[in-house]
Amino acid sequence: MSRIKKKFGNLLGLDKYFWSSRPNGLYSVNFHRIGDSADTQFDPCVYSCSTKELEQHLTFFKKHFRIISLSALSEYLRTNEKINERVMCITFDDGYIDNYSNALPILKSLNVTASFFIATGLIGNTVVPWWDKVAYLLKTYDPKAIKLSGWSEKVINQHDGDHFIRAVLASIKHCKRTAEEQIKELEAYLNHSG
């Protein structure tokens, strides 16, 4: 229904009225990944939009807001100057390579400033962020292939994400207990053989 309202509003020109009537002040927009979410083996929900959509968004923002840097915002805050227009800060989180390869060229071509928050702990190593690890496991692992030793006639169905995650967490706890038991056995063996 909201899609129909939006199209109807666009036909009547209400979208232009809506944005031109927004109050003065600071607006902030945050993006994560830019590209085609269908092409990733990791978390598709981290994608904010495609490159085409980013270009459309930025063009729209330029039309309705004065886009400022975080440094300019800092100056507003330092001087306690009142914001008498619609200003916007644009940020990108986590520092995925597509921010550089996809977003930056569009930002440059439209002469739009933005700030990038880089997850510095991921630079120079092959660490995959936890949310991408979880998404990768969920996309590539067959729930029916989980071996549940000691459980008879148990079937895992992907009724909803919560049930599957609880089953995985239970499996992790079981593995932890098993590892702790094996470490105790190894310690006992080493103490008796030494």
State what each model feature region is.
Residues 29, 61, 93, 107, ...:
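Conserved, mostly hydrophobic/aromatic
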Residues 46-82:
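C-terminal domain-boundary segment and adjacent tail
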Residues 35-49:
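Acidic/histidine-rich helix-loop elements
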Residues 1-30, 38:
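Membrane-proximal basic amphipathic "stem/tether" segments
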Residues 21, 127-194:
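Extended, charge-rich helix/loop segments that form flexible
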Residues 28-31, 118, 190:
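Short beta-strand segments
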Residues 32-36, 73-75, 95-97, 121-124:
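Short, solvent-exposed loop/turn segments at secondary-structure junctions
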Residues 87, 91-106, 110:
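Membrane-embedded segments
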